[in-house]
Every structure is written in structure tokens, then in C-alpha cells.
């Protein structure tokens, strides 16, 4: 079964609202073996919507729409779909009563505009909406299926999970399963080069790399007639990829880098403190996202000025004068200083030039040092990046977490 997702709403085209519906529906369809061939976004215009439906059904047998089911005049999805399928809109008394009851919960009375939401194509299956006043519906005709859903995610997602998935599962016999591997320390092009044989010879499963800030993900996707068989197809490909990429793979699924690092610290009961200059607390903020980190994360210091580095971290004045604050020597003294001050096993520091000003020929914007102290041993890493201030600060945090992860192995 081939599907298209058609999201309706001028607010989507204007960028006022992020289209999370398409992402959610695509993932859910993949889990039950339905392939999504196209995403479309269209404004609240009946003629354009009719043209989109005609185009979509030229190559798909399933079209799922979201949005345009509200009570106002520019909510035209229902009318457009009825016209496409050459169906009259008729009043559905049960839906009318449910809408009225729903409105009473908000101390509102039924209006003619709200009454519009109780009209549906004559031959359709109505999907109740316990979370709003816009029921959805399913219409089948001439080997075409249209599933019409409300736009707000808190209304659409429960309807999709409870009504749409059971309906679609009866129509398909295949299952698509995916596994995501998370990689950091090497870029997307390097990943693609290292696993080029796998990428060039893929059939089922397929392997697709995706670049994100500071990391690359690999999605391995298999299709079979059962979930178990699909997962079994993934196993040998995943094993081969892990052998090639080794510890550049830090996790899988929805696991974050900070979660992996925090788990190591907690499991090994290694206490940590952070000393940050250019990242200004972002590194500490990432670590404390993890529940339970309070047992090992003792302290975070933002030492932006030279004076605070000297007074708070015991960085030597002579070191600052000789090497400047942006140097491996200062990064190491910062890491050791915070660890000894806080009494922790680990101290980690960041110092650098995040921009947009402050760079020199010798210390350009994007020059970063990460210092690390682990139970008496010290390590330092130099980084050079180009980009805006936010990017440089964020990528520094990612690299600092990865530097710590690799040195804890």
C-alpha cells in the first residue's frame, strides 16, 4: 500500500506552526508496513486541495489529511474531500450531540459554525474525537482510501492510534521495522565512506545516513511479513556496521550522548564537576538533564573572566599571561582545578573563542580547548570550527561529552 500525507493549513505554509503531524504519521505507518511516498502541505483553498487529491491518488491508494476540519469558513478539507469523491454532506446527529456536549465542558453553546463540524460525506466511517470538536472520518471509493484527521496533534494522535491504526492493520500484511544507530566524532561523509560497501549493495534492509549537529545517525530499515522477521533482517547488518564504526557509535534509538555519559558516571560512581568559559553552563545543563545525575554531578562553575579562573579554579596567573585563556595549558588547569576544588573524580573544562568577535590570527574564532582530569590523569583536545556563536558553543558541548565518554572506556 502506497500512501501520501497531506497536511492542510495556511499557518503551516507561513511557518507559524511546525508540521509535526507528518513526522508522527510517517513513523506510525512505517511500523505497520505502509510506505509513505510523498508529503504535501497546502493552504486553506478548495481548488488547490482538489488538485492535490487528484494528483496524490494518481499513484497512491491511501491519502491521509490533517487539518481543515474546524468551524470557520476557511476550514474546507471536508467539503473538498466530499466533492472529490462526489458525495453529499449530511448531518450526523450523534456527532452533533457529542460536539454540543464537548462545548458545554468549556461553557460554550452550539453555533451554526460548530454545527458545520457535524456534517460528513454520506458514505463514510466517522472517527469520534473525545479531545476536540472536529471528528475525523474514513472514506473508501473506487479503490481509493482517504483518512481525514483534525490538525491539532493532541486530537490527531489519539485518533490515529486508537482508530486509524487498527483499521489499516487489517489492510496490510507486511511490517517495516527500523533501528537507528547514533554516531559522533566523525561526519556523515566519513561514515558513508567507511560503510560504502553496505550502502552500495543494500536491498532489504536499507541503510540511510542522516547528518545532525554534532552527530550522524544511521537508520537500518527492514520489511517483512512479521515484526520478528523484520528485526532478524536488521541484526547482521547492524553487527557489520558496529564492527566497522566501533566506538564512534555511542548509542541507538532515542538515546542521547549526555544520557550515555551520565549512565557511565552513575554506574561507576564517578563524581564530576564542570568548569566552563565559552560554553557558559551548557555542558553542565546537558548533564543535569539526566535523572539521577545528582548522585555524581557535584558542581558546575562558569569562569568567564581570567580573574574567576584564578580565584575559583586556581589557574596560575603565569599560565594565563604566557599562553592566554584560550590554550591547552589553561584548559588543563581549569579541569584539574575544578576537580580538586569540588573533590570529584573528574573535572572537565571548556575554553575558546565562540565569536562573533574576539578572534585573532593566532586564536581565531572557533578555536576551542577541552580539558579533562580523571583521577590524577589529564587529557586535552583542540578543536577548530567555523560557524556562528550558537553553533560553536553547542558543538563544543557535544565534543566535550564525547571526549569524556571515550576516555572513560
From Swiss-Prot:
Lineage top rank: taxon: Bacteria
Family that this chain belongs to: Belongs to the CinA family.
One Pfam family linked to the record: CinA
Record protein name field: Putative competence-damage inducible protein
Amino acid at each position: 500500500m502506497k500512501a501520501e500525507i497531506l497536511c492542510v493549513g495556511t499557518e503551516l505554509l507561513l511557518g507559524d506552526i511546525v508540521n509535526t503531524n507528518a513526522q508522527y504519521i510517517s513513523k506510525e505507518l512505517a511500523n505497520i508496513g505502509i510506505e509513505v511516498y510523498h508529503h504535501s502541505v497546502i493552504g486553506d483553498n478548495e481548488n488547490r486541495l482538489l488538485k492535490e487529491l487528484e494528483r496524490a491518488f494518481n499513484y497512491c491508494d491511501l491519502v491521509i489529511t490533517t487539518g481543515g476540519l474546524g468551524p470557520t469558513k476557511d476550514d474546507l478539507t471536508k467539503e473538498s474531500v466530499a466533492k472529490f469523491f462526489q458525495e453529499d454532506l449530511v448531518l450526523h446527529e450523534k456527532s452533533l450531540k457529542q460536539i454540543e456536549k464537548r462545548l458545554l465542558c468549556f461553557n460554550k453553546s452550539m453555533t451554526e459554525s460548530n454545527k458545520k463540524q457535524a456534517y460528513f460525506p454520506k458514505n463514510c466511517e466517522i472517527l469520534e474525537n473525545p479531545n476536540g470538536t472536529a471528528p475525523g472520518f474514513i472514506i473508501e471509493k473506487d479503490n481509493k482510501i482517504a483518512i481525514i484527521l483534525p490538525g491539532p496533534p493532541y486530537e490527531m494522535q489519539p485518533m490515529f492510534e486508537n482508530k486509524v491504526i487498527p483499521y489499516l492493520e487489517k489492510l496490510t500484511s507486511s511490517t517495516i521495522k527500523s533501528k537507528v544507530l547514533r554516531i559522533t566524532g566523525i561526519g556523515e561523509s566519513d561514515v558513508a565512506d567507511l560503510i560504502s560497501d553496505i550502502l552500495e549493495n543494500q536491498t532489504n534492509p536499507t541503510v540511510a545516513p542522516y547528518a545532525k549537529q554534532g552527530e550522524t545517525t544511521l537508520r537500518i530499515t527492514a520489511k517483512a511479513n512479521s515484526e520478528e522477521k523484520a528485526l532478524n533482517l536488521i541484526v547482521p547488518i547492524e553487527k557489520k556496521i558496529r564492527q566497522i564504526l566501533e566506538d564512534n557509535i555511542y548509542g541507538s534509538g532515542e538515546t542521547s550522548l549526555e544520557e550515555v555519559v551520565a549512565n557511565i558516571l552513575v554506574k561507576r560512581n564517578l563524581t564530576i564537576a564542570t568548569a566552563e568559559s565559552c560554553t557558559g553552563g551548557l555542558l553542565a545543563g546537558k548533564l543535569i538533564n539526566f535523572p539521577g545525575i545528582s548522585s555524581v554531578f557535584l558542581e558546575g562553575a562558569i569562569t568567564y573572566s581570567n580573574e574567576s579562573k584564578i580565584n575559583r579554579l586556581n589557574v596560575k596567573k603565569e599560565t594565563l599571561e604566557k599562553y592566554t585563556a584560550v590554550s591547552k595549558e589553561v584548559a588543563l588547569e581549569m579541569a584539574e582545578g575544578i576537580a580538586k576544588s569540588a573533590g570529584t573524580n573528574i573535572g572537565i573544562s571548556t575554553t575558546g573563542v565562540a565569536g562573533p568577535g574576539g578572534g585573532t590570527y593566532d586564536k581565531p574564532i572557533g578555536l576551542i580547548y577541552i580539558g579533562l582530569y580523571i583521577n590524577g590523569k589529564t587529557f586535552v583536545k583542540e578543536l577548530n570550527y567555523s560557524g556562528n556563536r550558537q553553533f560553536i558553543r553547542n558543538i563544543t558541548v557535544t565534543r566535550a561529552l564525547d571526549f569524556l565518554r571515550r576516555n572513560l572506556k
